[in-house]
Amino acid sequence: MKGLRGHNKKSFWGNTRLSDLLWPVTLLPGLISAYQPVYLGSRQSSPFLPPQIPLGDSPPLSDTHEFTLRHIFHRGTYQDPDLHRRLDITPDTRLRAVSDAGIESDVVTPNTPLVASSQPLIIERLADRRLSVIEEHLVTARSSGSAVALSPSDWVMDTLPGPNVTEKKTVVALAMMTANDYIEVPGTGDWQDIHGRFNHSGSFGWQGDGLRGHVYADKTNSTVVISLKGTSPALFDGEGTTTNDKINDNLFFSCCCGQGGSYLWRQVCDCQTTLYNANLTCIVEAMLDENRYYRASLDLYSNITEMYPNANVWLTGHSLGGAVSSLLGLTFGVPVVTFEAVPEALPAARLGLPSPPGHDSRYPQSRRNTGSYHFGHTADPVYMGTCNGVSSVCTWGGYAMESACHTGQMCVYDTVEDKGWRVGLSKHRINYVIANVLAGYDDVPPCAPEEECYDCELWKFFRSNGSEITTTTSATSTSTSTTTSRTSTCKTPGWWGCLDQTTTTETTSTSTSTSTCKTPGWFGCKDPTTTSDITSVPTITTTEPPMTSTTTCKTPGWFGCKDETTTQVIAPAATLTITEPPVTSTTTGKHLGRF
C-alpha cells in the first residue's frame, strides 16, 4: 500500500507539464478586472459622467489631510456653453494668483499643502445619488411645480468623514482654498477639452465666462475638496464674469429676478405680473436654463467625481460660489463649508431639490443633518441678507440680494458687537475675512440652524402650465328702496295734507356675478365668460284706505260751529298686493384683452 501511494504521487507530478501549472496565472488579470467596481449608469461616450457611489473601503472618519491643488476645471455658460476644460497641475505649471480686485500677481507655484482634519459627520441623503436619477427628480419637480415625493426607503442616514468645523486650522485651510483663484501663465499649462465640440484655437477671453472649480486632493486621494469661484468683486458691468455673476445673483437670490424693487437692480427675467405678484413657473424656468451656474456645477461635480470615484468629496466656496456649493451639497448629500455665502434657501426651494420625509421642500432651511456649515460675520450685509436697501452698495451696483435664509447651520462671528465694526460691503471679501476674522479670533464660533426665517413674505407667487381654470365670484349686493306715491289729483284735501290713500312700495334685488377663466394671461384673463343673474324679490304694495269725515252744524258762530256733531267712517282694511318679478340672466364677453 505504501508503494502504491508513492507510485501514484510520483506519477501525478511526473505527467504534469509546466504549461499546465501556469495557465491559471494567465487568467488572473481577467479575474482581477472582473472584481473592479462597476457603477450602474456609466456612460463612457458621454463627456458628462455621473457621480459614483464608492464601493471600496471607507476612509477613516477622523484623520489629518494635506491638500494640494491638482486640477482647475472650467465650465462655460453664456459665451461658450459647450466649453468644458481641465488643467492638470504639474511641477512645470506656472500660475498667477488673482486678487479680490481682479489684479494678477506675480508667478506662483501652488505646491504648499493646506492641512485640514476630518471628523465623523452624519448626513441624511438620497440612497441613489447617480446623476441620471438626480436629473429625473429635477425634471419631475420642473414639470409638476414641486419637489418629487420620495418614500423613506429612498433616504439613508450616513456617517462619513467630514471637515472638522470646530478646529480653527481646518476652517482657515478651507477658506484659503476659496481665496486661491489662479490663471495659468501662457505656455506653461495644457488645458484639455473634456469633449471636442469646442473649437478654442481662435478663442480669446474664454476664461472670463463660466464657472471655475479648483480641485484639491490629499496624498492618498481619499479626500477631495472642490472649491467653486464666487462673484467677481466689481460692482459695475465690465470684463470677466462680473455680468454673468450678477445675472445669477439676481436670478437666484431675488424674489423676482430683480423686478419689483429698485430701478437700479438689473432685471434678468420678466415674470412679475402685478405689484408683489409673480409667476413662479416663469422664474424656475429661467433658473434651470443650461447656461446657469447650478447646471454648470452639476457637470463639474460629475466629471470630478468620475476622476476620483472612491474619494470622499467636500465642497467649499465664497459668496456666490458658496451658495452654489451649498446647492450641490443638498443635491448629492456631501459636506459643505462656505464663507460669506449668499443666503441660498430661496433658490433651493425653487429648484425643487428632493427633501427627506417629514420636511417641507418649500422651506429647506428647516432641514436637519444636511452637512452644510456657513461661516460669516455680522458686519457683512451679503451674508446677513441685508444688502438690499435703497442706499446699499449692492443696490447701486445693480444687485438684487433679497434672500435672507440659509440652509444647514450658520457659524457667525459677531464682529459688530465684539469689534465695533460697521456694516459694509468692503468686509465681504474673502482675503479680508481670512486676515481679520478667521485668523483674528482665537476660536471658531458655535454653529446652529437658523430658526424662524422666511423669504419674500410680501410676495405672492402662482404657478402656471397653460391649463388652469380660474373662477371668480363677486360679492352679493342687496338694495332696498322705498317709494311713496300719491294720486295725481287730490279728491279729499285736509288741513295738513291730502286725505287720499298713500301707496308704499319696497323692492329688494340681489345681483350675483360669476367669472370663469379657461385661459389666464399675464395681466388678466384672455377669455372669461361672465354671467350675471339679477333676481328681484317680490314687490310688496300696501294700499291704505281713505279716511272719510262728515260734519253737521246747526248753530254756527263767529269762529266756528257752536254745536258741531262729527261722524267718522273708516273704510275697509288695507289691501296687500305681491307681484313676482322675472329673473334676468346676462352673459357677456368671451375674449377679453390683456387688460
UniProtKB/Swiss-Prot annotation:
The active site is at 319 (charge relay system). Pfam families: Lipase_3. PROSITE patterns: LIPASE_SER. Residues 1-20 are cytoplasmic. It comes from the Eukaryota. GO terms for molecular function: phospholipase activity; triacylglycerol lipase activity. InterPro entries: AB_hydrolase_fold, ATG15_Lipase, Fungal_lipase-type. Its EC number is 3.1.1.3. The keyword DNA repair does not apply. Gene3D superfamilies: alpha/beta hydrolase. GO terms for cellular component: endoplasmic reticulum; multivesicular body membrane; vacuolar lumen; vacuolar membrane. It is an enzyme of class 3 (hydrolase). Binds to both phosphatidylinositol (PI) and phosphatidylinositol 3,5-bisphosphate (PIP2). This is Putative lipase atg15. It comes from Aspergillus niger (strain ATCC MYA-4892 / CBS 513.88 / FGSC A1513).
